[in-house]
Amino acid sequence: MRFNQYSYINFPKENVLSELKKCGFDLQNTANHKDSLETFLRRFFFTYQDTNYPLSILAADKKTDLLTFFQSEDELTADIFYTVAFQLLGFSYLVDFEDSDVFRKETGFPIIYGDLIENLYQLLNTRTKKGNTLIDQLVSDGLIPEDNDYHYFNGKSLATFSNQDVIREVVYVESRVDTDQKGLSDLVKVSIIRPRFDGKIPAIMTASPYHQGTNDKASDKALYKMEGELKVKLPHKIELEKPQLNLVQPQGQAELIAEAEEKLTHINSSYTLNDYFLPRGFANLYVSGVGTKDSTGFMTNGDYQQIEAYKNVIDWLNGRCRAFTDHTRQRQVKADWSNGKVATTGLSYLGTMSNGLATTGVDGLEVIIAEAGISSWYNYYRENGLVTSPGGYPGEDFDSLAELTYSRNLLAGDYIRGNEAHQADLEKVKAQLDRKTGDYNQFWHDRNYLLNAHKVKAEVVFTHGSQDWNVKPLHVYQMFHALPTHIHKHLFFHNGAHVYMNNWQSIDFRESINALLTKKLLGQETDFQLPTVIWQDNTAPQTWLSLDNFGGQENCKTFSLGQEEQAIQNQYPDKDFERYGKTYQAFNTELYQGKANQITINLPVTKDLHLNGRAQLNLRIKSSTNKGLLSAQLLEFGQKKYLQPYPAILSARTIDNGRYHMLENLCELPFRPEAQRVVTKGYLNLQNRSDLLLVEDITADEWMDVQFELQPTIYKLKEGDTLRLVLYTTDFEITIRDNTDYHLTVDLAQSMLTLPC
């Protein structure tokens, strides 16, 4: 384990003493260090009647147990302090470590022995081996009462609200959109779990079209075959209009009553970060949105009608929209328990909705935590003039996602009444998708949140993985740079795939978000501020560093690609083409081994490099015909240890999100040997070589100069490493699978790779 502590806040000494005293640690500034440590430990072991026993089973050094040490005349030393501290954090002395000073350096332990009271205070705020901070572990065990009131420690809310005796209710928010054109505003179901409290509380809201269930069968039927010819497009400039949103006004009167009438029973799934905040005094709201089970309207996937309906939930929390008790719209209930302050959470589609909501500038949205969220839907299902699929989901497109998330069809009555209209709407969507050309058009323009990024007022926290080929890193990169300069923005850029990171051992992500939301939503005045970029070092396990920016580097390193011309044959023998189509993983393996139709260029790294931003290929290239698809991947090549993209379980159900509440696994990205690691990749239709909005002719056998930016990333390379650039045509996981007989030729002498560093 390595310690990477970003959540700790330096408080004045009087605050430290006061907070310790409130938790029963009655330490005196004038006492000697040894006496203070003993006083601290006897309170620490509050679950024991006889505190001599837990002291006797800890060690001060290799010869002395802690009780014997306190009964001796020996002085407290730094070595003894560290030895005790590591044991309190769950490490076994003489098993996990033998020399505390060596272990302190190996783990990056954040505490430097000096002022003992401040050391102990920071120790309580430090994560244990099993994933909780020490103070959270003690509170979970009953250190302070579960009194349904707020208690703070180091600028973070503690788990002092009951997660058993909570209010569980359902309301139906009246949106300002009418997606199915029935003349009534769409209703959106809101599932609420909130702690009991006499005052007003903030809300954690997760906007998830998946929450009420998904129609997997209908979605699977809507998948496309990726086999087909790359279309030759007529040259033209793509014209666009400013997206429009038509809103509807509230209709009719509704009796105001005191409480919701529908009780929330089981929910499909909760998000463990939300679970963590519930006993800390934050309401949990789950909203599936228009076109989902128990709501009304069509599934408009990603457009501002969908976003508006989610926004209206925040409006209701602030008294600007109504919520009915049921679908009759006869009775309404106010969110009189809400303080109006909201944070959004969730990954993938959920993080996408956070991005979209932020761009409305809605009052009350204080923080978004957008994890692996889409910023422009074109870049999810298309790339540079190509029809593409999200990584791992070949054949998926917007209409199959619509079928997946239109969960109203899971209710037989809704299916009978509404499926015909839903299918008619879906046909319109299919026509607008334009799978023939892969070009950007008005449909995608209406789902581009970057256009409204200037409206963002909330503080923004992103998480994204360098190995996320589902929602690719371009999404967070573009959103990060599109935000207004005065906005506080933060990015946790890890080396995983499309995954959550709130239960990783190496980073205090939950505690950092607690500090932020306690400040922004509960009004605690602290100096807490996350760094702009928190990056997971790819060269070592469990190592995180603070950076000033994502991209924007002034320096670069250029690699020449060779001296000769090389060709890429597009067509495969039928047997190989069929085999790769059935198992794209086999294609990826053989591509990395140099066995596919490709140009492979190994580039020695002659000095340490820290890639930060978008690698760019400048290529002199020609096609043997009037079309061309170019794929590129940049690998770090060579057998060595690399961080793996998916977290592994270190210990099962050891993270406590409250008081024995929603226990979850402690995880981490493994660090183990592999033959290579993908650094970045990209795909380009050569007819869109100059600009996404410009379609140009390709003249057979005529040289073209192409600038091709790959996916943004942050990646460290050391002298002696090897980069491998792979250029090819069809990618059997991502692109259309065109097996026509043509080839691309690259003049390597007139081509180069540039890395921002």
UniProtKB/Swiss-Prot annotation:
<feature type="active site" description="Charge relay system">
    <location>
        <position position="498"/>
    </location>
</feature>
<feature type="active site" description="Charge relay system">
    <location>
        <position position="468"/>
    </location>
</feature>
<dbReference type="Pfam" id="PF08530">
    <property type="entry name" value="PepX_C"/>
</dbReference>
<dbReference type="GO" id="GO:0008236">
    <property type="term" value="F:serine-type peptidase activity"/>
</dbReference>
<keyword id="KW-0720">Serine protease</keyword>
<dbReference type="GO" id="GO:0004177">
    <property type="term" value="F:aminopeptidase activity"/>
</dbReference>
<dbReference type="GO" id="GO:0008239">
    <property type="term" value="F:dipeptidyl-peptidase activity"/>
</dbReference>
<dbReference type="GO" id="GO:0005737">
    <property type="term" value="C:cytoplasm"/>
</dbReference>
<dbReference type="InterPro" id="IPR029058">
    <property type="entry name" value="AB_hydrolase_fold"/>
</dbReference>
<keyword id="KW-0031">Aminopeptidase</keyword>
<keyword id="KW-0378">Hydrolase</keyword>
<dbReference type="GO" id="GO:0006508">
    <property type="term" value="P:proteolysis"/>
</dbReference>
<dbReference type="InterPro" id="IPR050585">
    <property type="entry name" value="Xaa-Pro_dipeptidyl-ppase/CocE"/>
</dbReference>
<comment type="similarity">
    <text>Belongs to the peptidase S15 family.</text>
</comment>
<dbReference type="InterPro" id="IPR008252">
    <property type="entry name" value="Pept_S15_Xpro"/>
</dbReference>
<dbReference type="Pfam" id="PF02129">
    <property type="entry name" value="Peptidase_S15"/>
</dbReference>
<dbReference type="InterPro" id="IPR036313">
    <property type="entry name" value="PepX_N_dom_sf"/>
</dbReference>
<keyword id="KW-0645">Protease</keyword>
<dbReference type="InterPro" id="IPR000383">
    <property type="entry name" value="Xaa-Pro-like_dom"/>
</dbReference>
<dbReference type="Pfam" id="PF09168">
    <property type="entry name" value="PepX_N"/>
</dbReference>
<dbReference type="InterPro" id="IPR015251">
    <property type="entry name" value="PepX_N_dom"/>
</dbReference>
<feature type="active site" description="Charge relay system">
    <location>
        <position position="348"/>
    </location>
</feature>
<dbReference type="InterPro" id="IPR013736">
    <property type="entry name" value="Xaa-Pro_dipept_C"/>
</dbReference>
<dbReference type="InterPro" id="IPR008979">
    <property type="entry name" value="Galactose-bd-like_sf"/>
</dbReference>
<comment type="function">
    <text>Removes N-terminal dipeptides sequentially from polypeptides having unsubstituted N-termini provided that the penultimate residue is proline.</text>
</comment>
<keyword id="KW-0963">Cytoplasm</keyword>
<protein>
    <recommendedName>
        <fullName>Xaa-Pro dipeptidyl-peptidase</fullName>
        <ecNumber>3.4.14.11</ecNumber>
    </recommendedName>
</protein>
<comment type="subunit">
    <text>Homodimer.</text>
</comment>
